[in-house]
Amino acid sequence: MIKPKKLSSLMKQAVEETVPSIMVFTTTGSLLAYVSFEDPKDGLKRLDLAKRVRSIAALAGNMYSLYTATNPSPLVAESTDDVIAHQRDVLFETIIEFERGKLLIAAISIDGAEDKLYSKDPLLLGIVGTENAKEGMMQIKSELLKECITNELSTLGKPV
């Protein structure tokens, strides 16, 4: 299984003032790891932050599940086999704008690691941005984090 502390230290490098929270969770909304720019010392504030992050993960997982149930492929189906095969390789990624911020949800490929994660469903990466966060920077952070997490997943179960 992937180690949450290692995952958190990887994600900690990408948080900043305009990207205050990053999380990895399942499609059911179960939180695997998260990091936050703010590090409250007070126990109640830390608990409130954890509740907020879990709520975002649950909401994003639900949105992903609803989207894939109604639109299993992000591309319009064509009759050629090449296009249909390509559609299966395209992973879900979207940015949702809210009144007080943005949320990027991206699927992480777990090809070859399904047996180690005990799931065939993709992991999801959530990047929370403030209203001042640039979508392009959020997407770059998403791509880099997905690549690092995929590399980490590929080393699971291999001798060190």
From Swiss-Prot:
Keywords: Cytoplasm, Nucleus. The keyword Glycoprotein does not apply. Its main location: cytoplasm. GO terms for cellular component: cytosol; fungal-type vacuole membrane; nucleus; Ragulator complex. It is found in: Cytoplasm; Nucleus. GO terms for molecular function: guanyl-nucleotide exchange factor activity; protein-membrane adaptor activity. This is Uncharacterized protein C1778.05c. It comes from Schizosaccharomyces pombe (strain 972 / ATCC 24843) (Fission yeast).
